[in-house]
Amino acid sequence: MIKLIVGLGNPGAEYTATRHNAGFWLIDQLAREAGTTLRDERRFHGFYAKARLYGEEVHLLEPMTYMNRSGQSVVALAHFFKILPDQILVAHDELDLPPGTVKLKLGGGSGGHNGLKDISAHLSTQQYWRLRIGIGHPRDLIPDSARAGAKPDVANFVLKPPRKEEQDLIDASIERALAVMPVVVKGELERAMMQLHRNP
């Protein structure tokens, strides 16, 4: 059963619309669905709400520590409520998936994502659930003729807003993720994966 859903992003208005904040976008939607409001909770170093989602009690969290210190926030809440790593779902932007794609998985490496890297370090395990929201990779924007030897600027890419057509695809993928949340919060993760991965 999933007891904590974390969305990753950076605090501050200048980051709100950037690709790196896709995890925050999902949490904002979940809070709206639950009819609750995230509030600044200093002991958890983030914005937090206890929500009733689809008949289950779930903690929602947006760390306000900046991305590379997300683990500080996650572990503070997990320890306080005695939540185990495999009861945690972390929603984050995923460079290795195109916009419009969303995938669910348990464990694995960080794939260069500093938020995941810090969470794994603080939890002392990689065995927590991830909801990977595809944002695409900057290399995909380089013409084939210019790709040889090109070094895409990933840091700049994730800290910029998506183009409108990309945003529409990302929004649609978040809607698909929301559609499987009733199954996710009940702990039927394999079923949720089958439903989610049937679609691109």
UniProtKB/Swiss-Prot annotation:
Active-site residue list: 20
Keywords for this protein: Cytoplasm, Hydrolase, RNA-binding, tRNA-binding
Residue numbers binding tRNA: 15, 66, 68, 114
GO biological process, one term: rescue of stalled ribosome
GO molecular function: peptidyl-tRNA hydrolase activity; tRNA binding
InterPro entries, per database record: Pept_tRNA_hydro (IPR001328), Pept_tRNA_hydro_CS (IPR018171), Pept_tRNA_hydro_sf (IPR036416)
UniProt EC number: 3.1.1.29
One protein family per Pfam: Pept_tRNA_hydro
Domain of life, per lineage: Bacteria
GO CC annotations, alphabetized: cytoplasm
UniProt-annotated site: Discriminates between blocked and unblocked aminoacyl-tRNA, residues: 10
Residues with site note (Stabilizes the basic form of H active site to accept a proton): 93
Compartments it resides in: Cytoplasm
Catalytic reactions on record: an N-acyl-L-alpha-aminoacyl-tRNA + H2O = an N-acyl-L-amino acid + a tRNA + H(+)
Function: Hydrolyzes ribosome-free peptidyl-tRNAs (with 1 or more amino acids incorporated), which drop off the ribosome during protein synthesis, or as a result of ribosome stalling. Catalyzes the release of premature peptidyl moieties from peptidyl-tRNA molecules trapped in stalled 50S ribosomal subunits, and thus maintains levels of free tRNAs and 50S ribosomes.
Family per similarity comment: Belongs to the PTH family.
Record-given protein name: Peptidyl-tRNA hydrolase
Source species: Paraburkholderia phymatum (strain DSM 17167 / CIP 108236 / LMG 21445 / STM815)
